[in-house]
Amino acid sequence: MSDLGDESVAIVCDNGTGMVKAGFAGDDAPRAVFPSVVGRPRHRGVMVGMDEKDTFVGDEAQARRGILSLKYPIEHGVVSNWDDMEKIWHHTFYNELRLEPEEHPILLTEAPLNPKVNREKMTQIMFESFAFPSMYIGIQAVLSLYSSGRTTGIVLDSGDGVSHTVPIYEGYALPHAILRLDLAGRDLTEYLTKIMMERGYTYTTSAEREIVRDIKEKLCYIAVDYEQEMEKATTSSAIDRTYELPDGQVITIGAERFRCPEVLFQTSLIGMETSGIHETTYNSIMKCDVDIRKDLYGNIVLSGGTTMFPGIADRMNKEINALAPPSMKIKVVAPPERKYSVWVGGSILASLSSFAPMWITKAEYDEQGGAIVHRKCF
């Protein structure tokens, strides 16, 4: 635990498409994890007696989603609505972590290949709107790799809104070989909703969508051999599981359990024409210098909530083995804490004494402007 008496302890804030993970450097897990969502009343005056609050953030917004219209300011990993994003940050610092920004350095995370103007805008907001004394922006996949104790490897980072394969050599991401796949948790939840309709269960409202997400997280898994698993599902009920809905009704889910995340390997199931996560990983490795490929094949690190399905590492291993040169040694690493490994990597980095010179200070920002971020964070 960090000693909160020490006012200079850094804040680590990982802004994902689906969830914000925030806390203090040196801690082993984020203190605050809440949905990246901002809600505003659909109709003026509906919420009388609630001090007419005009915006709700995170869990507060989720809980009132019936009367609010919800907006997600991060799309596919990249901030697209700065006003709402600022509200999320404000909520993070003042309501969740309850701190004074001017007393702490802050480490933020960004998606790989985040546009330059976005990094500058983020820097500007931290210094000008929140008055942080110093800041740093780390690439999510690189932080995940650090948290696994490596500095070289390829990270498959898959969250709620986007997936990336990021080859990293001695601590630096190789931008020319990074690939982005617009397929992630949200798409899987949507697909599960669709295939459950075949059973006659319909989920349309955002509240019901949350139920489907929960079913996905609790019951889905990845088959090592999809065809074989399908066969097993038709001949026996061994894979059937039950799930109790909030209203007490009990539903049964069978083949859907592995059909849903199969999309990660067979994107054609949802009508996409792109490579699955295994092929994208392989393509990323092939874009790298031939001399470092061996190091990448031997250090394939999974990261993010959408890599949490049981069976994913075995299947990934099997698929990469089928693509790679025959004698290549392949290792797929699925760290148990990978749901939060980006945050954990940030926590480790920001608490190293050797990291001190890396912070961008307010003085440097005042002198050089937002572009300073490209010189110090890469």
Curated annotation (Swiss-Prot):
Family as reported in the entry's similarity comment: Belongs to the actin family.
InterPro entries linked to this entry: Actin, Actin/actin-like_CS, Actin_CS, ATPase_NBD
Name the record gives this protein: Putative actin-5
SUPFAM superfamilies: Actin-like ATPase domain
Subcellular compartments: Cytoplasm, Cytoskeleton
Family annotation (Pfam families): Actin (PF00022)
Oligomeric form and interacting partners: Polymerization of globular actin (G-actin) leads to a structural filament (F-actin) in the form of a two-stranded helix. The binding of profilin to monomeric G-actin cause the sequestration of actin into profilactin complexes, and prevents the polymerization.
Organism: Arabidopsis thaliana
First-listed, main subcellular location of the protein, grouped into a coarse class: cytoplasm
PANTHER family for the chain: ACTIN
SMART domains registered for this protein in UniProt: ACTIN
One of the record's GO molecular function terms: ATP binding
Protein purpose: Actins are highly conserved proteins that are involved in various types of cell motility and are ubiquitously expressed in all eukaryotic cells. Essential component of cell cytoskeleton; plays an important role in cytoplasmic streaming, cell shape determination, cell division, organelle movement and extension growth.
PROSITE patterns assigned: ACTINS_1, ACTINS_2, ACTINS_ACT_LIKE
Miscellaneous notes: There are 8 actin genes in A.thaliana.
UniProt keyword annotation of Membrane present: no
CDD domains: ASKHA_NBD_actin (cd10224)
Keywords annotated in UniProt: ATP-binding, Cytoplasm, Cytoskeleton, Nucleotide-binding
GO cellular component: cytoskeleton; cytosol
